[in-house]
Amino acid sequence: MAPDFYREAFRQAGMATTSGAAVEWTPQLALETMDAHGIAMSILSISFPGVHFGDDRAARALARRCNELAAELGQRWPGRFGAFAVLPLPEMEGALAELEFALDKLKLDGVILLASHAGRFLGDPALEPLLAELDRRSAVVLVHPGMHPSSRTLGLPWPGFMLEFVIDTSRAAINLLFSGALERFGNIKFILAHGGGVIPYISWRLSVAPIISPLVPQWPQERIFAGLRRFWYDTALCATGHALPALMQTAAPERILFGSDWPYAPAKVTGLSIEGIKEAPGVTDRLRAGIERDNALQLFPRLHG
């Protein structure tokens, strides 16, 4: 979701969408878009650039306002909206406090985390207090990319969503896996946005990394493939015959979820994604039903009601 007050906050902070496009969002427009594409329910989230623009107190206030709105939308339109809580990272005390409020008081469905915060990727020791609490709660965590500081220094003219986003998610996934955080915090259900970035395409490369280099944990290939199957993956901007076959080789089939990236990606892309899933080679009716609905019902049991 991208309510007016949130868009104004990141504009005032000098931020912009990585596509350069203007974004429109209201609950009514969301419902119209969902109805037009046969979408029964959306799990809303605040994605990049998050809510922390340099001031801890302001970030706490903005996170609270976003999360309370998300809860309000779920109450106003029951069965149509759920939500992932946004946290005021990298400020850890505020993030832990908001996590408790959002999950215990507001009853949100999980948490969205950027792949990196203040230059530190998920799996970094500095973020372990948060992962420990998420693990204790067996939380669902959507991992969404951002623009790592290093991406801004590359000198490439292309919008960040085209390449830097998928690399950012991939870096976080690799760090979670090879740092051991994915195993240490095994109760967390991590969803990787955008089909896991480039992870499906380089999964075999990752599996032979221990054979090539002493700098990575000396694990057998199957342990690495099993780690990659522990992630959940959404299909935002990768629901085509180009990408889905690779994703289906890497992910457990019951851990692939439909994602749209709307409103940052236009509604036309949502329609193309739905058609792409139908037409992708190897996607059976059963697998398509899982991606479009059944897998989400397993991840969010409350939706059964």
Whereabouts are the PLM-identified features?
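Conserved N-terminal glycine/acidic-rich loop preference
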Residues: 140-143, 147, 167-178, 182, ...
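Active-site-adjacent C-terminal substructures of enzyme catalytic domains
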Residues: 166-170, 181, 187, 211-212, ...
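Active-site gating/metal-coordination segments in enzymes
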Residues: 44-179
